[in-house]
Amino acid sequence: MDPIRGFCGKLRSLAVTLDSETARLQRALDGEDSDFEDCPMRVLHDLNSEVRILKDDVNILLDKANLESQENIGFIKATKILMRKNSMDIMKIKEFFQKYGYTPRAKKNSVDEQEVTDSKPESSECERPEKPDLKDDLLDSAAASTSVSEKSPRSPQLSDFGLERYIVSQVLPNPPQAVNNQKEEPKILTPFSKHSLLKTPKCALKMDDFECVTPKLEHFGISEYTMCLNDDYTIGLKNVKTNSETIETEPVPNDNVFATPGLITQPLGKNNAEHTHSPLAPTFCTPGLKVPSTKTSTAMVSTNSSSNDLETKESTSLVSNSDECFENFADPSSPTISSYENLLKTPTPPEVTTIPEDIRQILSKYNSNLASPVAVRAVSPINVFLPRHGGQNMRDASNKENW
């Protein structure tokens, strides 16, 4: 009884499992099972998202292709316009050149020529030896046609630019008589004679025969000790003491005052390196002012000394001895100034009647007698410059007071 019970229990459990499985499968087929609801929706969502992405990519690619096509279309249109402009410019240039004798070249169909030459190579070879006269005639006609077609270039005229009204008619006075008077002389064309030129002998150049001649070195007396002392100002300074005997000094006046150095002159007879021609004295055109002469005091007084001085030529030394200059100092004569009446455009001198207060205070420090203001008498302008007294002038006196 136990095995039968076990077998029946197993059959019952198998039947229950079969019923449950069939019911689950039926619900799954009908879509009522909750386990199979999420998978199709998820797959559909994924597919939908992928389709959208692909659609966006396709739209982007289409936009790019559309832009490229538009750019290509614009480029093609621009090239067409440029081709038209170029063709118009070429036609204008051809028309302009044709006015001056330019002939455009005829286009030749190279393809047709190749076909003709390939089809009849033998016939052309046979015709050449048989008909030489025809060939010569063709060459002559071709040469004539090319000479006619190729016009000689001519110079531009006003009619080419639409300026015919500015053309000046150049008519000869008697053209027929001039033509009749001219006699045609036969031109004798002599053949060009070729002069026979002598051939130059050929010889091999040997460098051993020629020696490189270097310039001869000559000593010019230049060394590190004498390179700065060759006939320049330094040599003049060195030789000035040796040539002091030949130097002449101007006479000194008898005034025992501090003198200015005068010019040391020497005659032009010597052409030493230390002496050169002295320039002429400058002439001043200031009215009423006479430049003091650096020559002797007696030369300024005499009136005929200027003409005698121009005749005699003198030269000055480049270097003067300092000892002699200090010994021969002389007081230059004061410039002679004419009266204010003879000067041109000279203002009248101011008349000073009293000493100003500030100047009086300064003068009172040096002189106690000027304690009170003193009336100053007007002095004529002629007596402003006082003469010398005992070899001294007023300038020296004022200088002694300041000392």
UniProtKB/Swiss-Prot annotation:
<keyword id="KW-0963">Cytoplasm</keyword>
<feature type="modified residue" description="Phosphoserine">
    <location>
        <position position="306"/>
    </location>
</feature>
<dbReference type="GO" id="GO:0007080">
    <property type="term" value="P:mitotic metaphase chromosome alignment"/>
</dbReference>
<dbReference type="GO" id="GO:0140499">
    <property type="term" value="P:negative regulation of mitotic spindle assembly checkpoint signaling"/>
</dbReference>
<dbReference type="GO" id="GO:0005813">
    <property type="term" value="C:centrosome"/>
</dbReference>
<dbReference type="GO" id="GO:0000278">
    <property type="term" value="P:mitotic cell cycle"/>
</dbReference>
<feature type="modified residue" description="Phosphoserine">
    <location>
        <position position="152"/>
    </location>
</feature>
<dbReference type="GO" id="GO:0031110">
    <property type="term" value="P:regulation of microtubule polymerization or depolymerization"/>
</dbReference>
<feature type="modified residue" description="Phosphoserine">
    <location>
        <position position="159"/>
    </location>
</feature>
<dbReference type="InterPro" id="IPR033341">
    <property type="entry name" value="SKA3"/>
</dbReference>
<feature type="modified residue" description="Phosphothreonine">
    <location>
        <position position="260"/>
    </location>
</feature>
<keyword id="KW-0206">Cytoskeleton</keyword>
<feature type="modified residue" description="Phosphothreonine">
    <location>
        <position position="348"/>
    </location>
</feature>
<dbReference type="GO" id="GO:0007059">
    <property type="term" value="P:chromosome segregation"/>
</dbReference>
<feature type="compositionally biased region" description="Basic and acidic residues">
    <location>
        <begin position="117"/>
        <end position="138"/>
    </location>
</feature>
<keyword id="KW-0131">Cell cycle</keyword>
<dbReference type="GO" id="GO:0000070">
    <property type="term" value="P:mitotic sister chromatid segregation"/>
</dbReference>
<keyword id="KW-0597">Phosphoprotein</keyword>
<keyword id="KW-0995">Kinetochore</keyword>
<dbReference type="GO" id="GO:0072687">
    <property type="term" value="C:meiotic spindle"/>
</dbReference>
<feature type="region of interest" description="Binds microtubules and contacts the microtubule-binding domain of SKA1">
    <location>
        <begin position="196"/>
        <end position="402"/>
    </location>
</feature>
<dbReference type="GO" id="GO:0000776">
    <property type="term" value="C:kinetochore"/>
</dbReference>
<dbReference type="GO" id="GO:0072686">
    <property type="term" value="C:mitotic spindle"/>
</dbReference>
<feature type="modified residue" description="Phosphoserine">
    <location>
        <position position="119"/>
    </location>
</feature>
<feature type="modified residue" description="Phosphothreonine">
    <location>
        <position position="346"/>
    </location>
</feature>
<dbReference type="GO" id="GO:0005737">
    <property type="term" value="C:cytoplasm"/>
</dbReference>
<protein>
    <recommendedName>
        <fullName>SKA complex subunit 3</fullName>
    </recommendedName>
</protein>
<keyword id="KW-0137">Centromere</keyword>
<feature type="modified residue" description="Phosphoserine">
    <location>
        <position position="334"/>
    </location>
</feature>
<keyword id="KW-0132">Cell division</keyword>
<feature type="compositionally biased region" description="Polar residues">
    <location>
        <begin position="148"/>
        <end position="157"/>
    </location>
</feature>
<keyword id="KW-0498">Mitosis</keyword>
<feature type="modified residue" description="Phosphoserine">
    <location>
        <position position="34"/>
    </location>
</feature>
<dbReference type="GO" id="GO:0051315">
    <property type="term" value="P:attachment of mitotic spindle microtubules to kinetochore"/>
</dbReference>
<dbReference type="GO" id="GO:0008017">
    <property type="term" value="F:microtubule binding"/>
</dbReference>
<dbReference type="GO" id="GO:0051296">
    <property type="term" value="P:establishment of meiotic spindle orientation"/>
</dbReference>
<comment type="function">
    <text>Component of the SKA complex, a microtubule plus end-binding complex of the outer kinetochore that stabilizes spindle microtubule-kinetochore attachments, promotes alignment of chromosomes at the mitotic spindle equator (chromosome congression) and assists suppression of the spindle assembly checkpoint. Kinetochores, consisting of a centromere-associated inner segment and a microtubule-contacting outer segment, play a crucial role in chromosome segregation by mediating the physical connection between centromeric DNA and spindle microtubules.</text>
</comment>
<dbReference type="GO" id="GO:0007056">
    <property type="term" value="P:spindle assembly involved in female meiosis"/>
</dbReference>
<dbReference type="GO" id="GO:0051301">
    <property type="term" value="P:cell division"/>
</dbReference>
<feature type="modified residue" description="Phosphoserine">
    <location>
        <position position="278"/>
    </location>
</feature>
<feature type="modified residue" description="Phosphoserine">
    <location>
        <position position="155"/>
    </location>
</feature>
<feature type="region of interest" description="Required for localization to kinetochores">
    <location>
        <begin position="331"/>
        <end position="402"/>
    </location>
</feature>
